[in-house]
Amino acid sequence: MNYNNQTIHKKQCVMNELQQALDKIHSADTLIIGASNGLSISEGIHIFGSNQDFYDHFGDFAQKFGFNNIIRGCFYPFAPENYWAYFARLYHYMNIKRPVTAVMNDLYQLVQDKNYFVVTSNFDNHFRLAGFDENRLFEIEGVGKDLECQTCQSVFDGTDILTQLAQIENGEIVTSDIPKCQECGGELKIHVQLDEHFVFDKTWQQKRHAYQDILAQGKHGNTVLLELGVGIRNQLIKQPFMQYTYQNPNAFYISVNKGDLWIPDEIANRSVGINGDLASVIHDWATR
């Protein structure tokens, strides 16, 4: 009996936290969304996972090169032909094999009428595919559909190129298939920050300024920082979000993650932490 009472109390606390967070989202003048790997995992994309899904889609690369998850493949020192075979496969996986799910659709439904902005370290392109406004989306470490030239510092949409490469049978790309920069003919890479040569082009700079602008704007109103699937050691999103909340008395911080939550005492009275399944939490909010 006592166990049942404790269970009921725990469920009630969770429901109260969900409602408090939703009320804050609804009343926000400005909503800043920060998303990382946990959100991708909720959609079935686990770049750190050494799981059956990885071997089903990248097993030939695993067998040939010895890595056991997507992210290790991203850092592998491939020969150029294998590099493009891998990243074309990864593009196809993230955009076609693992399309946008109800998680992103629910999130968009929840926030579409708000003054929102998204900052994310995910490079799967799913915010864009779900309909989020391009001008209110800052993919801080790039996106796997774009290509960059480190010679002339240009960045452009690589959708057509990656789609064509992904269709080459067995991923057997040859030297003549390797794309070149449309501006200078230089060597291309995927526009994802994997080393110190990442191209911070004009569009990236504009997105950064837009992010800074909405943070400044948020200081003058009721601002909610909604953090989705961000680990406690994240320096790109979590630390700035917590610091912003600490420095701005009108800010409220919401962190949703499964089994990986931390809220400092200094902002605890203006925060809610929800330890739960992202898909379930977002669906609950979108359908209340």
Regions found by a protein language model. Give the residues of each.
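Conserved catalytic alpha/beta core of Sir2/sirtuin-type deacylases, generalized to analogous enzyme cores
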Residues: 2-288
